[in-house]
């Protein structure tokens, strides 16, 4: 359920663009829906996840610049900035603070050696770097409509493939241990 909630602003952005072909209207929908998502989270739980704050800040700044300057390039940069912040955050957390973010998220569900946790963190950081670069490539080499479709379907599809590939690697390791 949380996954769908987190995906809602992207789905609404896509729906608004698909219905109108207007990236500025779709950007406004993304801003409002992200702000509403954070507000609802605060109202229901008296807590907002750090990623929701980051998403809200990015959509307010880059979406706001898109609307104020009437320049779609700002909203097209948003996924890249988010991906690169995530990748950098994973690396900084692991290398500078010796706190592996993947282990912090999954450590209670699965037991792995430290070297494998480190590999997972580097794999995710690399994936986020790749996704950020790929977003820019699509945004600035293809039509606006192609980018909007890539933002939802391409990004989600590649994420799913990456997660499944990691699941296969982890399942092989777990089977070896059992």
Swiss-Prot record:
InterPro entries: YciB (IPR006008). The chain crosses the membrane at residues 12-32, 50-70, 74-94, 120-140, 145-165. It is a multi-pass membrane protein. The keyword Membrane applies. The keyword Cell inner membrane applies. It is found in: Cell inner membrane. It holds the Pfam family IspA. It comes from the Bacteria. Keywords: Cell inner membrane, Cell membrane, Membrane, Transmembrane, Transmembrane helix. PANTHER family: INNER MEMBRANE-SPANNING PROTEIN YCIB, INTRACELLULAR SEPTATION PROTEIN A-RELATED. Belongs to the YciB family. Plays a role in cell envelope biogenesis, maintenance of cell envelope integrity and membrane homeostasis. This is Inner membrane-spanning protein YciB. It comes from Laribacter hongkongensis (strain HLHK9).
């Amino acid at each position: 359920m949380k996954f769908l909630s987190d995906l809602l602003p992207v789905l609404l952005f896509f729906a608004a663009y698909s219905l109108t072909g207007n990236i500025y209207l779709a950007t406004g929908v993304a801003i409002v829906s992200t702000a509403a998502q954070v507000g609802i989270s605060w109202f229901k739980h008296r807590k907002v996840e750090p990623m929701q704050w980051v998403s809200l800040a990015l959509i307010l700044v880059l979406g706001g610049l898109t609307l104020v300057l009437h320049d779609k390039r700002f909203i097209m940069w948003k996924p890249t900035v988010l991906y690169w912040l995530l990748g950098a955050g994973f690396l900084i957390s692991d290398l500078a603070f010796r706190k592996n973010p993947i282990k912090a998220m999954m450590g209670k569900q699965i037991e792995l050696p430290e070297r494998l946790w480190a590999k997972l963190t580097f794999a995710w950081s690399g994936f986020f770097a790749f996704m950020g670069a790929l977003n820019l490539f699509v945004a600035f080499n293809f039509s606006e409509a192609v980018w909007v479709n890539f933002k939802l379907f391409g990004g989600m599809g590649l994420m799913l493939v990456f997660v499944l590939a990691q699941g296969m690697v982890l399942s092989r390791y777990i089977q070896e241990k059992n």
